[in-house]
Structure formats: structure tokens, C-alpha cells
Amino acid sequence: MQSKTLQNWLHLQRIVRFGDTDAAGVIHFHQLLRWSHEAWEESLDRYGLKAVDVFPSSLGISTSTSVALPIVHCEADFFLPIGIGDKLNVQLVPVRLNIGSFEVQFTFQRREQNVAVALVRHRSIDSDSRRLCDLPEGIDRWLEASSLHRGVSAI
């Protein structure tokens, strides 16, 4: 597996496009949650986890996982308007909650100023039985590697 730095898989960038905005020229609120999910997918890919190894498929594509990671909670807060052409830095902070769930906190910045934050929480389930289960190994590794730069903290 290639050398990974936090810079290249937990710190991403996004440019606001015309199609992301509403008639007032600012992003429509739901875009932030879509961008958050896309940033999570990009982070996994940059870390070295392929989508087919993380997400079960119903398209007849053979996958190596029978675990689904549905979103069980999400929220977003906006601090400043976000408009067409804005170049945003997106920082991801993944946090393991227990052996079967985790959340990712997202901070969106424009010129080093926070413009929005989001949080997306996932729960691991067996995709066939829909019963709760442990997180898949790849997600475990991604969470562990993500936490290394934060050090040890008291629970």
C-alpha cells in the first residue's frame, strides 16, 4: 500500500459550481451533506479502500463485503454564505464511537475561515440480515489511521 499522509486523505478541496447553488447564488443546504459524503468516499479511495470493497452492490458486481454502513444521523451548520467559485478546504475528522459505529466530522473552510461544519454518523449492519455487526476491517484500519495524529485522549 502506498505511503499515506493525513494531508492527502483527510484534507480535501472542493470548488463550488453553478449547479450547486440556488437562485440567490449560494449553495442549497442539502449540498453540504452531499459534499460531506463525497469527501468521505474520496478519503477512503485516497487511503486505498476501493468503493467495491466498502459498499455492497446490487448491480451484480461481486463485492468482498456483506456489511452496509447506513447513515443513522446527520447535521450541518452554516456560518457564512458559500457561493459560486468559492474554493473550499474540507477537513475530515473520523471518530470511532464503538465496535459497530463511527462518525465523520467535516469542517469546510474558505481562506482559512470556517464557513460550515457537518457531521455524518454511520452504523454497521449485515446487508443480508440487517442485524447490527462490527465495522468491516477496511473501515477499522481507516479509523485507526485517522486517529493516530490526534494522539490518545481520555474517554
Swiss-Prot record:
InterPro entries: DHNA_CoA_hydrolase, HotDog_dom_sf. GO terms for molecular function: 1,4-dihydroxy-2-naphthoyl-CoA thioesterase activity. Its EC number is 3.1.2.28. It comes from the Bacteria. Pathway: Cofactor biosynthesis; phylloquinone biosynthesis; Quinol/quinone metabolism; 1,4-dihydroxy-2-naphthoate biosynthesis; 1,4-dihydroxy-2-naphthoate from chorismate: step 7/7. It holds the Pfam family 4HBT_2. Coiled coil: none annotated. The keyword Hydrolase applies. Keywords: Hydrolase. The active site is at 22. It catalyses: 1,4-dihydroxy-2-naphthoyl-CoA + H2O = 1,4-dihydroxy-2-naphthoate + CoA + H(+). One of its GO terms (biological process) is phylloquinone biosynthetic process. Catalyzes the hydrolysis of 1,4-dihydroxy-2-naphthoyl-CoA (DHNA-CoA) to 1,4-dihydroxy-2-naphthoate (DHNA), a reaction involved in phylloquinone (vitamin K1) biosynthesis. Belongs to the 4-hydroxybenzoyl-CoA thioesterase family. DHNA-CoA hydrolase subfamily. This is 1,4-dihydroxy-2-naphthoyl-CoA hydrolase. It comes from Prochlorococcus marinus (strain SARG / CCMP1375 / SS120). The lineage of its organism: Bacteria, Bacillati, Cyanobacteriota, Cyanophyceae, Synechococcales.
